[in-house]
Regions:
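Class I S-adenosyl-L-methionine
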Residues: 78-83, 100-300
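C-terminal target-recognition/interaction regions appended to catalytic cores
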Residues: 237-397
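A short, structural micro-pattern
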Residues: 37, 173-175, 226, 319, ...
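Short alpha-helical segments and helix-capping/turn motifs at coil-helix boundaries
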Residues: 74-75, 163-168, 307-311
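Short Gly/aromatic-enriched secondary-structure transition segments
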Residues: 59, 196-198, 340-344
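Core alpha/beta nucleotide-donor-binding catalytic domains of modification enzymes
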Residues: 2-126, 136-140, 144-148
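Glycine-centered loop/turn positions within well-structured domains
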Residues: 96, 189, 213, 332, ...
Length: 397
């Protein structure tokens, strides 16, 4: 099916790379203990994302440029491949027009033009496989019209499938549903393929993890869920405005140990400041609770015409699972981002833990920029699971 591919590492180009969550997953992917992929090039117009990635991974080329202004021949040149020889093209083109709050705006939203830009690179570069990560609503936007447009745009040369996957099924301690679109080039002889996912996503409560399926019922790639405490419980306790640069206890879960690796210094563990009046009100929310569970006099949206979302000012539960980490998780009012133990919002490092970044991956820039980079990233462990699954297919294993 894929002649000669099992004798070399597979080449990868990442467009709309951001801080490199997808690329991190592909870089971590292994088969028989050996790396599967070689990252040839990352491209994004965000200089802050580039600074963070280049500092962490200085040996991998990162082009800071608006991809819509980059010629396809330049991508091939910088990635050191010829047209048709690139193994995998990956990316998460921004499509904010498909977010839950904007589900009625799809094809007419100019922010969704970047999806078409990515697909033009698929046509022009002709990779053996392409993978797109995006928001779940992409598949239903405009009554499915945009998804059909994506499929039809490349269907002449690719077998294309899509699935909505949940990060918590792949070792990521976070409830995060995302759409993945994968296409195999038809001349490779792939008649059909599937995604590694459970038919019905396991159910949870915001407060308490429900029992996951027994391991014998799971595909090998599917992992038991990881609770909030299992993910971040080893990180030092902080007061608002406080910070910690060193670990104060040993990891007590495999997940914590894996994220630490050999790290000795703790980066990005700085708590946002909150005023006393705000903290007094926040203290009334119990572990696992939210603003909606407060009585009328105590609610944060008291007297407001527009009521807050159900997860606003939500507090994590140590035995529960983190909700979707967004680009605004330093703000307790934007979701369930208040620490279960400490009276504060979670830190950038805790957000990165929920996203499955290793502790030695340091985020640079102002805190507001750091939270954006973390929240917009593809969880590396989720990317790794898919990279290993499809990589094994390409290598005939």
């Amino acid at each position: 099916m894929f002649p000669n591919l099992n004798h070399r590492m597979l080449s990868v180009v990442d467009l709309f790379a951001g801080v490199g969550g997808l690329s991190e997953g592909f870089a971590r992917a292994r088969t028989d203990g050996k790396p599967i992929y070689e990252l040839r090039l990352l491209v994004d117009k965000d200089p802050e994302a580039a600074l963070t990635y280049r500092t962490n991974r200085p040996g991998i080329p990162y082009l800071v440029e608006d991809i819509s202004n980059v010629a396809q021949k330049d991508i091939l040149s910088k990635a050191r491949v010829r047209k048709g020889d690139l193994d995998i093209l990956i990316g998460g083109p921004p499509c904010q027009g498909f977010s839950v709050l904007r589900r009625n705006r799809a094809l007419d939203d100019p922010r969704n033009e970047m999806m078409r830009v990515f697909l033009r690179f698929v046509r022009g570069l002709r990779p053996r496989l392409f993978m797109i990560e995006n928001v779940p609503n992409l598949l239903v936007a405009a009554e499915g019209k945009f998804w059909r447009e994506i499929r039809d745009f490349v269907s002449e040369n690719y077998i294309v499938k899509a699935a909505i996957l949940n990060a918590c099924d792949y070792g990521v301690p976070q409830w995060r549903k995302r759409t993945f679109i994968v296409g195999f080039r038809k001349d490779l002889g792939v008649d059909d393929f599937s995604f590694p996912f459970v038919e019905e996503t396991r159910k949870i409560s915001p407060k308490q993890l429900t029992p996951h399926l027994g391991d014998e019922e799971l595909l090998p790639i599917i992992r038991p869920w990881i609770s909030t405490e299992e993910a971040i419980g080893d990180l030092p306790s902080l007061r608002p405005g406080g910070e910690a640069s060193f670990y104060t206890q040993e990891p007590f879960t495999d997940y914590q140990a894996a994220r630490r690796k050999d790290s000795r210094i703790l980066a990005n563990h700085i708590a946002r400041r909150h005023d006393e009046k705000f903290l007094q009100k926040l203290s009334k929310i119990e572990e696992g609770g939210s603003n909606q569970e407060l009585d009328g006099r105590r609610r944060f949206d008291r007297g407001r015409e527009i009521k807050y979302l159900s997860q606003a000012y939500g507090r994590l539960h140590r035995k529960g699972i983190a909700q979707t980490i967004t680009a605004h998780f330093l703000n307790p009012g934007s979701g369930r981002f208040t620490h279960y133990r400490d009276l504060r919002s979670i830190t950038v490092r805790e957000g990165a833990r929920f996203q499955s970044f290793d502790d030695d991956f340091v985020f640079y820039g102002k805190m507001q920029s750091q939270q954006r980079l973390v929240g917009n990233a593809v969880p590396p462990l989720m990317a790794r699971a898919l990279a290993e699954y499809f990589g094994s297919m390409m290598l005939g294993q």
